[in-house]
Swiss-Prot record:
Motif (Beta-hairpin) on chain: 105-128
Annotated organism of origin: Chlamydia muridarum (strain MoPn / Nigg)
Residues that hold ATP according to the record: 52-59
Protein name per its UniProtKB record: UvrABC system protein B
Keyword check for ATP-binding: yes
Length: 676
């Protein structure tokens, strides 16, 4: 297995400190949790659990532990929504450090597949999000360059990317005073996946007389300007990528590739040889099956020619083990391989994230089986895959599992090293659920909703057992003039994002769904959580899920939870006992310290586009995904036109508007909850 390597000519990785900045100090259970977790990591305890209730400040505790331990850190979240939220929070806690974001960069992804029964081949189709691609490259650049790096990632971190050895060996180190033949330098930039372009754009370079401007693949706010006298490099400046106004001068610079899949020429030649060898063996296997034999020969030889000519081909990831030198069946290289041996792994919402880690491999292998069996791909395609859970566990050398309801697996792995964080800084205790009959539950719920709506700014979450029931209840409430909406996996990303925004802004008062846990809904405005048919045992009626649902009302001083059930199931019984235990701990603490429960003030996330910019563009502050994509395209065109006309102030304005729209689009797309 490939592990951390820094082959940048022996250059030292920057050993900066994590500097935590926060307007408050640890309180309640936080100081002891921080002390125990930090000491456990430094003492070599491989696995610990932070059992923290909703609203107890687990993220702040994690930030303090990271600052204390001071090693590169990976925070793993189970979906894009939570990854985005954690990224924003950690950026605020560590503004001087490298806080990065690594999720799947596909806006749309249809994997390659073959359906044998209908003889249907589905070609891979995808749309890559340029902004996320930049953030992914920024993440790997940071972890190779500096130890004060914190990467927040989705499950995407266990999927194969190019090896850190190949990636970093293609980095280009330039120093003032040295000679670099211009033609060779340009050719090297092309091999690094930078393209020659007259316009300023990411992953491109522009030659003008004695100057080469490089627009970095992993940075949108800075470009690099190289100035030469003949072939001697006399100046390196960081500049604004549009105005090219210098920011600061440096004696040297390291330029990283524009793709994780770049490879040195020697590696590429070796890969071509081993691909041909595998092809020859597979053609013998298909002896007597001319259709599969011809198909595989044509497809693979075409790919080989593309790799020879341009160093890349469509679907090159299917040949990944040939480029990394791995043996068949060996784990692929992934983001985890970019980290040093002593890195800290924090698995957030571990009760959901660990089952995901287990599931990723099986789904990937079943799809590729028919592609290999019918000659669309070589068997080495099987090795372009996510890690198995057992392979991923090899990286669990220093891990903290974080959850309000840790699963059996985390508890076993931690071997008793479970640190509780029950006390909420707000003083709000867990609401003790009321059990009411399931018979007549809708009428009873309606009365509860009406009582809540008489109060200002209070919201209601309703958990149903089926999508159809969620839709029916929303329609029923709407007929009665109640602002209600349903939310489930059948809702498109853009619409789901808008529903969540409307709930926060007050346009919607009641939200009905099947699995509202996955949406990351944690709002102080929610004062009532109602679980319909709570006695129907299943995944979303397990004791862990029921405790999580209760936590959704624990941020409001008037929080109330109602379980509609005709019997108390074992899951409900466990939930009631655990909730009472946690509630009593909080009440005792409040009494001892004379604390009065108070609500938290959680600001509504504003549109990142400035008011001035929004007014000039005459668009509403809350835009749909389609509107944002259209805005980005318009701003980009206007930016390039202004730059070409040397109207740099105007170009910078459109650049800022475009980047703000990209950030908002990234946040919206994160709301889809896709695991990668």
């Amino acid at each position: 297995m490939t592990h951390y390597h820094n082959p940048l000519n022996g250059r030292k990785v920057l050993n900066q400190q994590f500097v935590l900045q926060a307007p408050f100090l640890p309180c309640g259970d936080q100081p002891e949790a921080i002390r125990q977790l930090s000491r456990g990591i430094l003492d070599g305890i491989p696995s610990q659990v932070l059992l923290g209730t909703t609203g107890s400040g687990k993220t702040f505790t994690m930030a303090n532990v990271i600052a204390n331990v001071n090693v590169p850190t990976l925070v793993l979240a189970h979906n894009k929504t939570l990854a985005a939220q954690l990224y924003q929070e950690f950026k605020a806690f560590f503004p001087e450090n490298a806080v990065e974001y690594f999720i799947s960069y596909y806006d749309y992804y249809q994997p390659e597949a073959y359906i044998a029964r209908s003889d249907t081949y589905i070609e891979k189709s995808l749309l890559i999000n340029d902004e996320i691609d930049k953030l992914r490259l920024s993440a790997t650049r940071s972890i190779l360059e500096r130890r004060d790096t914190l990467i927040v990632s989705s499950i995407s971190c266990i999927y194969g990317i190019g090896s850190p050895d190949n990636y970093s060996s293609m980095a280009l180190i330039l120093e003032v005073g040295k000679e670099y033949p211009r033609s060779q330098l340009s050719a090297q930039l092309v091999r690094m996946h930078y393209q020659a372009s007259a316009s300023p754009q990411r992953s491109a370079f522009r030659e003008r007389g004695s100057v080469i401007d490089i627009f970095l693949a992993y940075e949108s706010d800075l470009a690099v300007r190289l100035e030469f006298v003949n072939d001697t490099l006399v100046s390196i400046e960081y500049t604004d990528p549009l105005t090219m106004i210098p920011s600061h001068t440096v004696p040297s610079v390291t330029l990283y590739p524009g793709s994780h899949y770049v490879t040195p020429e020697a590696v590429r030649e070796q890969a071509i040889r081993t691909i041909r060898e595998e092809l020859e063996q597979r053609l013998l296997f298909f002896e007597g099956r001319p259709v599969e034999q011809e198909r595989l020969f044509q497809r693979t030889t075409h790919d080989i020619e593309m790799i020879k000519e341009i160093g890349f081909c469509k679907g090159i990831e299917n040949y990944s083990r040939h480029f990394t030198g791995a043996a068949p069946g060996e784990p692929p290289t992934c983001l985890l391989d970019y980290f040093p041996e002593d890195f800290l792994l924090i698995i957030d919402e571990s009760h959901q994230t660990l089952p995901q880690l287990r599931a990723m491999y099986r789904g990937d292998q079943s799809r590729k089986q028919s592609l290999v069996e019918y000659g669309f791909r070589l068997p080495s395609a099987f090795d372009n895959r996510p890690l198995t859970y057992e392979e991923a566990r090899r990286y669990f050398r220093r891990v903290v599992y974080v959850s309000a309801t840790p699963g059996e697996l985390e508890v076993q792995e931690s071997r008793g090293h479970i640190i509780e964080q029950i006390i909420r800084p707000t003083g709000i205790p867990d609401p003790l659920p009321e059990i009411r009959p399931a018979t007549g539950q809708i009428d009873d719920l309606l009365e509860e909703i009406r009582q809540r709506l008489r109060k200002d700014q209070e919201k209601i979450l309703v958990v149903s057992v089926t999508k159809k029931l969620a839709e029916d209840i929303a329609a029923f409430l709407a007929e009665l003039g109640i602002a209600a909406a349903y939310l489930h996996s059948g809702i498109e990303t853009a619409e789901r994002t808008q529903i969540l925004t409307d709930l926060r802004l007050g346009t919607i008062d009641v939200l009905i769904g099947v699995n509202l846990l996955r949406e990351g809904i944690d709002l102080p405005e929610v004062s009532l959580v109602a679980i319909l048919d709570a006695d129907k045992e299943g995944f979303l009626r397990s004791s862990a899920s029921l405790i999580q649902f209760c936590g959704r009302a624990a941020r409001n001083v008037h929080g109330k939870v109602i379980f509609y059930a005709d019997r108390i199931t074992p899951s409900m019984d466990h939930m009631l006992k655990e909730t009472e235990r946690r509630r009593q701990i909080q009440l005792d603490y409040n009494k001892k310290h004379n604390i009065t429960p108070k609500p938290i003030i959680k600001p509504i996330l504003a549109n990142p586009i400035t008011k001035e910019g929004a007014q000039e563009d005459s668009r509403p502050e809350t835009q749909s995904t389609e509107d944002l994509e259209s805005s980005i395209k318009q701003y980009e065109e206007a930016m390039y036109k202004a730059a070409q006309d040397f109207q740099f102030d105007e170009a910078a304005k459109y650049r800022d508007l475009m980047n703000a729209a990209k950030r908002q689009l990234l946040f919206k797309q994160g709301e889809d909850g896709n695991s990668k």
